[in-house]
């Protein structure tokens, strides 16, 4: 600290020591650090208070609207928008099961067979349905007469037999006689649908057919061509191809050759 001290004389001649306090950049005193910390704390508190006020402003502070007692819809008037609340869906009512009480085991078997017949009636033919109705009536009478004395094994066998009969039947929408009549009608319609050729059609077909020249004309055409070719060959090689003999006048001399076979 000696360099910051200097001595000077006062008016009375006393020597006083004075200290020069210089401002050093980057150095803080305790009072300045405390003031900066207090300012930072104040800013943080102000920011948290502002965020709290903003969050409270976004919440629906006022709700305007009424809810109907009968479960109807209502409107909620919020500060920013209006919200529509739909009524809750009513729970589906439970379907009451229909239970048919049978008087005895025979009636129960007949009802079971009738239910099976109704399930398979959509795919069975009319003839099969009539036969099944007759057999069902007979079986129901027998079941009513001796339902108490029929063992369980025979009942299961009869039920399996009925199921087998229903499976073995082939669905058909026409009787055999109707099918044969329909096929004959279709065949007759196809035969009748073929139109007979008329005179104009026959003449048109005749005109479109290629015309073939007669045999005499064809023979005359090829004979003229063969004659011209024979004349050209005789003039060039002094040989008559029609008769098969050489000609005297010419530059070629023809010599007969005896074949080995002869």
Swiss-Prot record:
Residues 198-208 have a biased composition (Low complexity). InterPro entries: CDI_dom (IPR003175), CDI_dom_sf (IPR044898), KRP (IPR044275). GO terms for cellular component: nucleus. Pfam families: CDI (PF02234). GO terms for molecular function: cyclin-dependent protein serine/threonine kinase inhibitor activity. Induction: Down-regulated by cytokinin. Residues 140-212 are annotated as: Disordered. Plants overexpressing KRP1 show a reduction in the filling rate of about 2/3, and no embryo is observed in the empty seeds or seeds containing underdeveloped endosperm. Regulates the production of endosperm cells, affecting seed filling and embryo development. Regulates endoreduplication of endosperm cells. May play a role in the exit from the mitotic cell cycle during rice grain formation. Inhibitis leaf elongation rates by decreasing cell number, that is partly compensated by increased cell size. May not affect growth rate or cell size of the primary root. Belongs to the CDI family. ICK/KRP subfamily. This is Cyclin-dependent kinase inhibitor 1. It comes from Oryza sativa subsp. japonica. The gene is KRP1.
